A protein has these predicted regions:
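Conserved C-terminal alpha-helix-loop-beta "cap" of PLP-dependent enzymes
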Residues: 168-244
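Conserved PLP-enzyme active-site core in the AAT-like
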Residues: 1-128, 193, 208, 212, ...
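Active-site C-terminal subdomain of aminotransferase-like
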Residues: 86-192, 196-199
Length: 244
């Protein structure tokens, strides 16, 4: 059974999470930054989940980790992400690569193969297949994962991107994304027609309210001027029908 906690106020309300999480809850899944682009209090949600013996799974934007708290430091047990932003163009929707990491106690439950760092006989850094299930080779139909060539190539592309950027480069990119998003929000809200829907801190995306309450007409005008304005949120949230 899956229970959804609404976050139409901008971020996930901790009190609402506490009401639905109990000793029978297997895991809590949260996205950070969330669908609205706002930054969640992951540490607080982690405390609520762990107090009931549940795991915390977090879906993240890899670029945001250049400036946001590391998921592990916030108490996250399993982290997943879409890796497209790590050096891969949009490519009309794919192929991309998925990212998954976990605490060491769960490593043997991860699908696929686990590569580990070691040294060779000349004390040079190298990588080896540390863990892999027999099914990967002898019973492919029962294997937990089969990574195809496309995903392998894009994983290599992401590895090259990360090695070139380095920690400081990732921080710079994350800061640039945030600065440009906040600049865009500042410029839009100088117009009487627009205002920010939420006061929460945001990373890339942000929600704008159309004070004239004519989102569809606004989107049509933007399209005619070759502008991809955003998603009309009323299709998911009735209370945000004037937002995008």
């Amino acid at each position: 059974e899956m229970v959804v906690v609404e976050c139409s106020a901008g971020t996930t309300p901790a009190a609402a999470v506490a009401q639905v999480v109990d000793e029978e809850t297997a895991a809590v899944l949260i996205q950070n930054p969330n669908f609205f682009g706002n930054v969640e209090d992951v540490t607080l949600i982690s405390e609520i989940a762990h107090a009931q013996g549940a795991l915390l799974v977090c879906s993240v934007d890899p670029i945001s980790l250049g400036i946001l708290q590391r998921p592990g430091d916030a108490g996250v047990d399993i982290v997943v992400a879409e890796g497209q932003s790590l050096g891969t163009p949009l490519l009309y929707g794919g192929p991309y690569l998925g990212i998954m990491a976990c605490r060491e106690s769960f490593v043997r439950r991860l699908p696929g193969r686990i590569a580990g760092e070691t040294v060779d006989r000349d004390d040079k850094q190298c990588w080896v297949l540390t863990l892999q299930t027999r099914e990967q080779h002898i019973r492919r139909e029962k294997a937990t994962s089969n990574i195809c060539t496309n995903q392998g190539l894009f994983a290599l592309r992401a590895a090259i991107y990360l090695s070139l950027m380095g920690p400081q480069g990732m921080q710079d990119v994350a800061n640039l994304c945030t600065q440009k998003a906040h600049y865009a929000a500042e410029q839009l809200t100088q117009h009487d027609r627009f205002e920010l829907a939420f006061s929460d801190g945001f990373f890339k995306e942000f929600v704008v309210r159309d004070t004239q309450n004519d989102v569809q007409q606004l989107l049509q005008q933007a399209c005619e001027n070759n502008i991809l304005a955003g998603l009309p949120l009323g299709q998911w949230y009735d209370e945000l029908e004037d937002c995008l």
